[in-house]
Regions:
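A hydrophobic/aromatic-rich effector-binding and dimerization subdomain
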Residues: 2-19, 75-139
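Generic protein-terminus/edge-of-domain signal
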Residues: 1-67, 106-107, 117-120
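A short, compositionally biased micro-patch
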Residues: 46-48, 71, 81
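Short beta-turn/strand-loop junction motif enriched in small, turn-promoting residues
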Residues: 51, 73-75
Length: 139
């Protein structure tokens, strides 16, 4: 994956050295988030009318509530209406890595860390995977 230009890198740090993860939730007060990227992966959930999400300059918007997965260094932007609900979790993928080497580390985590395994851009809430994500992440 080609790294986006440094000028679009988001300067904000998410989490800290001890816990490289951050959670955000809000009723949208910001109507636009310009193109940017960050070193963290992001799991984003949006519901409401009148929103759009762009990932790597491709519009992945739908009218239904959805989860969006933003891989490391993936360029993205959003336009949101005032009635949208937004939940976001940003994390450094290396925090998932084990200190011991096993099959999960070899077949799942190392490809994820090396960006050889990528999440899909969007998972609809109505799908079985979307329902599982809702149960796991939106408690």
């Amino acid at each position: 994956m080609k790294q986006p230009p440094e000028t679009l890198k988001e300067p904000r740090k998410h989490g800290n050295m001890e816990f490289p993860c951050a959670f955000y939730d809000s009723i949208c007060t910001i109507t636009s988030v310009s193109h940017h990227w960050h070193e963290e992966m992001e799991i984003l959930y949006i519901e409401g009318s009148g929103y759009s999400v762009e990932v790597d300059t491709h519009d992945v918007t739908t009218e239904e509530p959805s989860f969006y997965f933003l891989n490391q260094e993936q360029l993205h932007s959003m336009k949101l209406s005032a009635d949208c609900l937004e939940y976001a979790m940003l994390f450094r993928p290396d925090m998932l890595s084990f200190s011991s080497y096993d099959l999960t580390q070899q077949q799942l985590l190392l490809p994820l860390l090396g960006q050889k395994l990528l999440f899909p851009s969007r998972i609809p809430l109505a799908s079985p995977a979307g329902q599982e994500l809702k149960t796991s992440l939106l408690r």
